[in-house]
Curated annotation (Swiss-Prot):
Lineage: superkingdom: Eukaryota
GO annotation (BP), single: regulation of DNA-templated transcription
Source organism of this protein record: Arabidopsis thaliana
Name of the protein this chain belongs to: Uncharacterized protein At4g00950
Entry's transmembrane regions: none
Biased composition (Low complexity): 28-43, 59-78
Molecular functions (GO terms): DNA-binding transcription factor activity
Region Disordered, annotated ranges: 1-82
InterPro entries noted in UniProt: DUF688
Cystine bridges: none
Organism ancestry: Eukaryota, Viridiplantae, Streptophyta, Embryophyta, Tracheophyta
Length: 291
């Protein structure tokens, strides 16, 4: 009875079977001609192609242009909008002002910077300039403004203040007359700039009109004081320009007051005294000869 019940229970149970998956061999043909997914990559054409490997054909282009590379045919397309490069900021300023950009500035404006629209012919950066004119005139300066605003500096009482504060001081240098009324050579004309560190630099020489004007003023002053360009100038007139005190040399003695040179007898007396002193200090031994 028990065996029959077991067979009935087994018949009522449903047997679940696992699905069998189809097995495929894991073999790939690694050929160098085409990749694994060649169909997917070939279906995406480039922007200048209608289909992969087929460039776009244009009715306006000739047969010679159609036979050229796809890049040139795409660039000559009338339907495409070409994007040009943007102008630099300094050219944008010209367009805003209503000017044309047909003629660009010369490369000299590189010194003024990319955003500077000034038309200055000289660079406004600190520099040292040196120029030699004539036989003895030498000029040079350390200045940031070459055109120069040194005319506005005061001469006189501000000289000591400028030297103490470390700034440049402008001193008017006459250099007309020397000692005893003789005319000395003027090596430095115009103005002289004094800087700290015991460096002396004469001023710049781009002022020919200024020098000529100074020459005329000096000539007028010479005529006003009563002398001309000749060298026959009195010492009183030269003292107007150079305050020089010449101390007189006083003679404190003469050749008669000098002691007379010692005679030969005094010399011999001196050496005898020296010899006597040496004999007292150094013991002298007399050599006795034995017979």
């Amino acid at each position: 009875m028990e065996a029959e019940k077991e067979t009935e229970q087994e018949g009522n149970l449903t047997v679940m079977k696992l699905p069998v998956l189809p097995t495929k061999p894991n073999t790939h043909s690694h050929s160098m001609s085409s990749p694994i997914h060649s169909s997917i990559s070939a279906s995406v054409p480039f922007s200048w192609e209608e289909e992969p490997g087929k460039p776009k054909q244009h009715s306006t282009s000739s047969s010679s242009s159609s036979s050229s590379s796809p890049l040139t045919s795409y660039s000559s397309s009338p339907f495409e909008t070409h994007k040009s490069l943007e102008l630099p900021p300094r050219l944008h300023l010209l367009e805003k002002d209503g000017g044309s950009v047909t003629k660009l500035h010369s490369p000299i404006t590189v010194f003024d910077g990319p955003y500077s629209m000034t038309t200055s012919k000289r660079m406004d950066s600190p520099s040292f300039r040196m120029m030699v004119k004539g036989s003895a005139d030498c000029y040079g300066s350390f200045r940031s403004d070459i055109d120069g605003d040194l005319e506005d500096l005061e001469v006189g009482s501000k000289q000591q203040e400028n030297l103490s504060s470390g700034s440049l001081a402008v001193v008017k240098k006459r250099g007309r007359l020397g000692f005893f009324g003789f005319r000395r050579r003027r090596a430095l004309k115009g103005k002289t700039e004094f800087g700290r560190g015991s460096y002396v630099f004469p001023s710049s020489v781009d002022r020919e009109s200024e020098y000529s004007r100074k020459e005329e003023e000096e000539e007028k002053e010479d005529k006003r004081f009563g002398y001309d360009d000749t060298d026959g100038i009195s010492c009183s007139q030269s003292s107007r320009f150079c305050d020089v005190k010449i101390s007189s040399i006083s003679r404190t003695g003469s050749f008669s007051t000098l002691p007379a040179p010692p005679s030969s007898s005094s010399k011999s007396h001196f050496w005898t005294n020296v010899y006597a002193g040496l004999k007292q200090v150094v013991p002298w031994k007399s050599k006795k000869t034995t017979v």
